[in-house]
Each structure stands twice: as C-alpha cells, then as structure tokens.
Curated annotation (Swiss-Prot):
Its main location: cytoplasm. It comes from Acinetobacter baumannii (strain ATCC 17978 / DSM 105126 / CIP 53.77 / LMG 1025 / NCDC KC755 / 5377). Keywords: Cytoplasm, DNA-binding, Transcription, Transcription regulation. InterPro entries: Integrase-like_N (IPR017856), TACO1_YebC-like_2nd/3rd_dom (IPR048300), TACO1_YebC_N (IPR049083), Transcrip_reg_TACO1-like (IPR002876), Transcrip_reg_TACO1-like_dom3 (IPR026564), YebC-like (IPR029072). GO terms for cellular component: cytosol. One of its GO terms (biological process) is regulation of DNA-templated transcription. It is found in: Cytoplasm. This is Probable transcriptional regulatory protein A1S_1496.
Length: 249
C-alpha cells in the first residue's frame, strides 16, 4: 500500500501543477466520444463513460459540452478515424511505462512518443514488452478514512475484490466488469468517492532511490502527458521516501 500512497501523492502533485485547462478538456472530450461510441450513451450502463463524465464535471466542463461529445460518439461524427493505441517502454532505472493514446494519425503519434523516451534516456519497446507487468482493474478512492467500516461492508457486498486503507485514503479495488456495480452500490449508500476509474495497475514496482533518475522519470511522464494524443500514462515507479521528499520540495 505504501507504493500506492507514494504514487498517489505524485499524481496529486502533478494534477495540481497541470494548468492547461484546454488540453485537459480536449483529452476528456476524446475519451467521452470514444466511450460513448464503444459502450453507448447511457452512463448508467457504461462505466467507462460514467467515469470520464465525472472527471470532466470535476474540472468544470459544462453538461452541454459533455452531451455534445456523447452525441458525437453515438452518432459516429468526426471520430471514425480515431484509434486507441497503447505504447510500451522503459524509463531509467527499469521503470515500466504504458502510454494510452487516442489518435487519428499514427505517423504523428509514434515519433512524438518515441521522442519522449529518447530525451529522458528511456526506450520505446515493442507490444507486450511491459504490458504483462500491469493488471486492468477498477479503483474507487475515498479521502475520508473514518468511513472505512461502511465502505468495506457496502463494497464487499457489491462484489469488490479488495480494500486497502492507508493513512490518507481508502482504496476499493474491483474487476473491470464489476466496477460500475460497486460504484453504484457505494453511491446508493450515500458514499461519494473522491475518484473512480479503471486503470492499469502495476503488479511489481521499480523503486527509484536516486534523485536524478527520479527527475528523469518525472520528466518522461510530464512530456508524455503534454502530448495531445496521450490519454493516460501508467508506470510501476515507486520513489523512496527521501526521493519523494526532494521531488515535493
């Protein structure tokens, strides 16, 4: 759980630093369009769509904008050429990296992603080179740890696979298939999550204890996330307490 907490801290810090509201909107709109295209327009029966709609609302995207994106998805307008492609590679220190993209031009995306790896002493790998180190799962988080007992009762009854509790959050873990059901059950019980999404979770961690390597890893993540075509970046990095303190300084 320590690794999850450390990485959560880095993710939160990164989110606070990300001032590009327009870029965030663009990425969420692409995800909404694709989620609606693949799973339908009803968030109640489309967990992927519901998760991204909640994220979009959290950054103050209007309902009108969200609904237009959903209609684009189900109507097939302007998105027929949009493809989901995942790239895999390694950063310094043997850190595994999964890069989920949504692109209409692979000739643009591949060089852009490769450039990020090469500029930070990493390597873009082939399909399957690191994917086996990650597991797809649902994660529902709560910042109020005083709700532990109630969350545990409701989530496990609804089919959650596991619950992890740290000093600052409760993490409910589900299979991708039961993610929506567990989320519904928690909401029906009056338990509003602080974040809910289906992610690629690392099964093993690569610990970084050197601050220079840590900065290279963070630079790689930042460069990838700044690319317009990139939707999500997942790694198996775990920073030591000393390195984490220096990164947060």
């Amino acid at each position: 759980m320590a690794g999850h907490s450390k990485w959560a801290n880095i993710k939160h810090r990164k989110a606070k630093q990300d001032a590009s509201r327009g870029k965030v909107f663009t990425k969420y709109i692409r995800e909404i369009v694709t989620a609606a295209k693949l799973g339908g327009a009803d968030p109640a029966s489309n967990p992927r769509l519901r998760a991204v709609v909640e994220k979009a609302l959290s950054v103050n995207m209007t309902r009108d904008t969200i609904n237009r994106a959903i209609q684009r998805g189900v109507g097939g307008e302007d998105n027929d050429d949009l493809k989901e492609v995942t790239y895999e590679g390694y950063g310094v220190g043997g850190v595994a990296v999964l890069v989920e993209t949504m692109t209409d031009n692979l000739n643009r995306t591949v060089p852009d992603v490769r450039h990020c790896f090469s500029k930070t002493n990493g390597n873009l790998g082939t399909a399957g080179s690191v994917a086996y180190l990650f597991t797809k799962r649902g994660e529902i988080t709560f910042d109020d740890i005083s709700l532990e007992d109630k969350i545990m009762d409701v989530a496990l009854e609804a089919g959650a696979e596991d619950i992890e509790v740290s000093e600052d959050e409760i993490l409910v873990i589900t299979s991708p298939e039961t993610f929506g059901e567990v989320q519904d059950a928690l909401a029906a019980a009056g338990l509003k999550s602080d974040n809910a999404e289906v992610v690629m979770s690392p099964s093993t961690k690569a610990e970084i204890t050197d601050i220079d390597q840590a900065k290279q890893v963070m630079k790689l993540i930042d460069m990838l996330e700044d690319l317009d075509d990139v939707q999500n970046v997942y790694t198996n990095v775990e920073f030591s307490d000393e390195v984490l303190a220096q990164l947060d300084a």
